[in-house]
Amino acid sequence: MIIWLAELLQPYLSFFRLFEYLSFRAILSVLTALGLSLWMGPIMIKRLQMLQIGQVVRNEGPESHFSKRGTPTMGGIMILAAISITILLWTDLSNPYVWAVLTVLLGYGAIGFVDDYRKVVRKNTDGLIARWKYFWQSLIAFVVAFALYAYGKDTAATQLVVPFFKDIMPQLGLMYIILTYFVIVGTSNAVNLTDGLDGLAIMPTVLVAAGFAVIAWATGNVNFSEYLHIPYLPHASELVVVCTAIVGAGLGFLWFNTYPAQVFMGDVGSLALGGALGTIAVLVRQELILVIMGGVFVMETLSVILQVGSYKLRGQRIFRMAPIHHHYELKGWPEPRVIVRFWIISMVLVLIGLATLKVR
């Protein structure tokens, strides 16, 4: 929005030429989203407390979690508001990639909102019925996948980029739609599973978004994309501003979500942020690097799959409790230790993911 206004005012005030620079808008994006989150945080927490919208805690969970019962949840609303406002302010709204991310972010946020509402307001511990949750997630993912495929059919936008290999970029064809579906839905649910401790999900989300900001910048730059042997996608550069909006909003939320948390993001935040990260990975053609950079999310998801599979096949559990962060809690690790160590793992994995761009 601002970029259009700046174009109109450039002939009169040269200052507005600054808004043409991606780096300038990326910095403003971080600061705007951070400021909005910090401003909305106390208001949101107070409002949620007044409405008695508090966290539901499972009785079979770690005893240390019982004290969290009643902590305001659905704080993801302020994350989505900060990201959305920032994107509308600082991105080029004629860019289709921006709208693809916004569609998934707000669509999955709506699904998470209904799920949270049923849990904490209607006191239905199951929330939104699983099959309906997956139906709406799938519908949104397929709509976005079909739209992106139609827009970039048989171009670099539908190639598969394989880490460590500079000459292996097969054209996916219709498989692009299937891959896009699984990446968006899978990442959304993976972040949702990770969101079980104070700040555990939001910091890896911030780190992965920061990593994708670098990748989006390189992908949208003709010289660097050629140098790194990755597809050149001119629309991808605008995703830098989207990623930095996620970084800023996430850091602002972490201010209130750090241990001991004053507010939780709820499904409205985790499903939306995961879906947005998956969409960004698809748009910059780095789905496989997402598996590396988002390794904490992958680890949490695999722990659940292995736990359920082992119990059904052998009648035995592999972990004391899944997702795996609860396993370490039950082993006696203090919650802050689990959180910070997972953050460190996430930071290392993001750096490894970025390194793969050069190691080819």
From Swiss-Prot:
Mode of membrane association: Multi-pass membrane protein
Subcellular location: Cell inner membrane
Recorded GO CC terms: plasma membrane
One of the record's GO molecular function terms: phospho-N-acetylmuramoyl-pentapeptide-transferase activity
Cysteine pairings via disulfide bonds: none
Cell wall biogenesis/degradation in keyword set: yes
Gene encoding the protein: mraY
Protein name: Phospho-N-acetylmuramoyl-pentapeptide-transferase
Group of enzyme by EC: transferase
Entry-linked NCBIfam families: mraY
Chief localisation class: membrane
Keywords: Cell cycle, Cell division, Cell inner membrane, Cell membrane, Cell shape, Cell wall biogenesis/degradation, Magnesium, Membrane, Metal-binding, Peptidoglycan synthesis, Transferase, Transmembrane, Transmembrane helix
EC code: 2.7.8.13
